[in-house]
Swiss-Prot record:
Mannosyltransferase involved in glycosylphosphatidylinositol-anchor biosynthesis. Transfers the first alpha-1,4-mannose to GlcN-acyl-PI during GPI precursor assembly. Required for cell wall integrity. It comes from Eremothecium gossypii (strain ATCC 10895 / CBS 109.51 / FGSC 9923 / NRRL Y-1056) (Yeast). It is an enzyme of class 2 (transferase). It is found in: Endoplasmic reticulum membrane. GO terms for molecular function: alpha-1,4-mannosyltransferase activity; glycolipid mannosyltransferase activity; mannosyltransferase activity. Pathway: Glycolipid biosynthesis; glycosylphosphatidylinositol-anchor biosynthesis. This is GPI mannosyltransferase 1. Its EC number is 2.4.1.-. GO terms for biological process: fungal-type cell wall organization; GPI anchor biosynthetic process.
């Protein structure tokens, strides 16, 4: 890395140390804690692992055992916060690879775009609160770096680990296939087969290994649970009210809506890959991954702040060749932040002041946030299509 890039990474590290230190202070002095409640779940699960037991002895642990293994040093060192440093490390490494994938654009532009991850307060807050999304961010960027370098077996291996860690990256299989089909000439099928076998072998291998150690509870908690998940706390999703009423039994129904909630999002995620057919380049594939992830989070039955990390990871690459004006960009940011703030205000009144805000206030906030994100998605798709049109015009001239 060049000197300016090293300084940016250092600034990102110092910012994270600052947020981390403040978090310890807030935990000790304020009623509202800085540390994510899920981090305590990870920590407790790691204690069971350190004792030679299953992490699934901890109620609400719904993740791969690999995550609990990563936090075992918390108990060796007798310091609950050590695991946050692990997540911060993955966060910074993801930022380095984001910068790497920006390629050879102008120095100033590259630093500004990389700052959208490395100096982003949302990203920094998530990792320093002890959320594990930075591990996923690292794995996704790592497999993309290998894919760009045409290291298909390595890319497939890392991609398989990413899917094992969390299921959602499986939606990237279609744009990856389209990209390889269009960029590898007559050897495209062999390249695709190589990556596919590596991905499947890794995914199945990890699954068999975890099943051998922990049995059915691994499958039940790490995978099956997420298809019928009905969380309604801290949930920005349009499905929030329906899931709340369904889980509370207030409105009796014979239909488990949580099982069908994924159908619209899968349709949208598949549909946006059409944009890649227009210009099947690696850069455009990253834009499509951004569109897919944004759509997936928007239409997901559970949508919390940590899920925003999933698409913010691709934002620097998406904005590399954007046609959006500065004024339009500011408006979109205001729309995203404003509708989110309205939801958070109502959520605060519900959770910390005990007011019944579910209907109509919180419901209307969910609808408003959803519609705002649908509008944002439409603008992003139009932006991609304008770029593809300009690229194709240049090729014909």
């Amino acid at each position: 890395m060049k000197r300016e890039e090293c300084l940016l990474v250092l600034a990102g590290l110092l910012a994270r140390v600052g947020f981390f230190s403040y978090g310890i202070y807030q935990d000790a002095h304020f009623a509202v804690k800085y540390t994510d409640i899920d981090y305590h779940v990870f920590h407790d699960a790691a204690r069971y692992v350190a004792q030679g037991n299953s992490p699934y002895l901890r109620d609400t642990y719904r993740y791969t055992p690999l995550l609990s293994w990563m936090l075992v040093p918390n108990h060796w060192l007798q310091w609950v916060h050590f695991g946050k440093f692990i997540f911060v490390l993955f966060d910074l490494l993801a930022g380095v690879m984001v910068m790497n994938l920006l390629g050879k654009c102008g120095r100033r532009r590259k630093l500004i775009l990389a700052s959208l991850w490395l100096l982003n307060p949302v990203v920094i807050t998530v990792s320093t609160r002890g959320n594990a999304e930075s591990v996923m961010a690292f794995l996704i960027m790592w497999f993309l770096v290998h894919l760009r370098n045409r290291q298909f077996a390595l890319s497939g291996f890392v991609y398989g680990v990413a899917i094992h860690f969390k299921i959602y990256p499986i939606i990237y299989a279609l744009p990856i296939s389209i990209y390889i089909r269009s960029s590898e000439g007559s050897r495209w099928f062999l390249r695709l087969l190589t990556m596919g076998i590596a991905t499947l072998a890794t995914l199945v291998g990890c699954g068999i290994g975890m099943y051998y150690i922990y049995g059915w509870e691994f499958l039940e908690h790490a995978y099956i649970y997420h298809f019928t998940r009905t969380d309604h706390r801290h949930n920005f999703s349009l499905w929030n009210m329906l899931l709340y009423l369904d889980s509370s039994g207030v409105v009796p129904t014979t239909i488990n809506w949580a099982e069908f909630a994924f159908l619209p999002q899968l349709f949208i995620c598949a549909a946006v890959t059409y944009v890649l057919w227009e210009a099947p380049t690696f850069q455009n594939m990253q834009c499509v991954l951004f569109l897919q992830t944004f759509a997936f989070v928007t239409y997901n039955k559970v949508c919390t702040s940590q899920y925003f990390i999933w698409y913010l990871l691709f934002l620097p690459s998406f904005l590399l060749d954007t046609t959006l004006s500065g004024a339009k960009g500011i408006f979109l940011i205001f729309l995203w932040v404003g509708t989110q703030a309205w939801w958070l205000y109502n959520g605060y009144l519900l959770e910390f002041e005990g007011k019944n805000m579910f209907y109509p206030r919180l419901f209307s906030a969910c609808v408003t946030f959803f519609l705002a994100n649908v509008y944002l998605l439409a603008q992003f798709i139009l932006d991609c299509r304008r770029r593809n049109y300009q690229t194709n015009i240049k090729k014909t001239n």
